[in-house]
């Protein structure tokens, strides 16, 4: 997977690989400069690589070299992470940092953005589950909310699609930047919703912390509180369906969806 690019781009391995079903990442150096080589083996990851290249370092890690299947990225600092900030009692700061990175991504207006997936397609699994009467009421509420949002989007943008505490990293003098996008297109508020399911269950489902986060994100992103809550309901439902389909627990997204629904008076 990596050997072709090690030769082509004159790279030296600088750590062990991280492999997945969708590709792999390898720490490397190039001319003594730390970097990360990311190789995609599926279209979703290729789409993300193309979007990273299009952002050109604006709110995202800088891409130094690229082709259809691979990108060579600047390497982040190991610490601190946003998850560590939240765990240390600085969750407000972590949320504001993530919101700033998202705003920079959405502000990018270079010509010819790469191919992206519409949000309606992204929500297919949730909308399909909603037709099954055997599923939990919260999923039906999530699906109905998603239907309304997707039918009348506002303030659309090219979206990262997977903003959470592990996908906004510290790049030292360059600040906090995003990695690993999905490459979507739709209402910009969507990109903030996944923050509410992260970085840990106990924090995500704490009602007081949830309400505090809603206020922080609405203010930092300059978005309507009610609209944000609706997108949280929709996103958390989709996340829960994915977890259920994969045989994993969906406790966190289901509880987050219920918190948002109750704040909206839907449950």
Regions found by a protein language model. Give the residues of each.
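Conserved NTP-binding catalytic cores of kinases and kinase-like/nucleotidyltransferase enzymes
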Residues: 1-60, 66, 171-173, 260-267
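Regulatory N- and C-terminal appendages and interdomain linkers associated
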Residues: 1-14, 45-48, 136-141, 208-209, ...
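An alpha-helical support segment within catalytic cores of ATP-dependent transferases
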Residues: 2-4, 107-161, 171, 219
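A general structural signal marking secondary-structure boundaries and capping sites
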Residues: 9, 102, 106-110, 199, ...
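Active-site acidic catalytic loop and adjacent metal/ATP-binding pocket
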Residues: 18, 24-29, 36-37, 63, ...
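Small/polar glycine-rich anion-binding or flexible loop at a beta-alpha turn
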Residues: 21, 231-237
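A conserved alpha-helical element in kinase catalytic cores
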Residues: 32-72, 76, 80-105
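Active-site Asp-x-Gly
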Residues: 171-225, 230, 251-258, 264-265
């Amino acid at each position: 997977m990596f050997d072709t690019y090690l030769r082509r781009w004159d790279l030296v391995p600088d750590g062990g690989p991280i492999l997945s079903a969708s590709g792999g990442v390898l720490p490397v150096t190039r001319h003594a400069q730390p970097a990360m080589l990311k190789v995609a083996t599926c279209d979703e990851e290729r789409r993300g690589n193309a979007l990273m290249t299009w952002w050109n370092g604006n709110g995202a890690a800088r891409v130094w070299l690229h082709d259809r299947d691979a990108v060579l990225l600047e390497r982040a600092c190991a610490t601190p992470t946003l998850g560590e900030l939240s765990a240390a009692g600085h969750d407000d700061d972590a949320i504001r940092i993530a919101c700033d990175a998202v705003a920079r991504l959405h502000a990018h207006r270079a010509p010819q953005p790469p191919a992206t997936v519409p949000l309606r397609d992204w929500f297919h699994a949730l909308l399909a589950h909603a037709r099954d009467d055997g599923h939990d009421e919260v999923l039906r509420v999530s699906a109905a909310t998603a239907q309304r949002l997707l039918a009348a989007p506002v303030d659309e943008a090219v979206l990262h699609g997977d903003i959470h505490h592990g996908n906004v990293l510290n790049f030292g003098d360059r600040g906090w930047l995003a990695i690993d996008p999905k490459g979507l297109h739709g209402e910009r508020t969507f990109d903030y919703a996944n923050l509410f399911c992260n970085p840990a269950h106990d924090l995500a489902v704490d009602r007081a912390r949830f309400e505090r986060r809603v206020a922080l994100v609405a203010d930092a992103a300059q978005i309507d509180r009610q609209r944000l809550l609706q997108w949280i309901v929709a996103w958390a439902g989709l996340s829960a369906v994915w977890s259920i389909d994969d045989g994993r627990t969906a406790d966190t997204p289901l509880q987050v969806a219920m918190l948002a629904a109750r704040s909206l008076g839907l449950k």
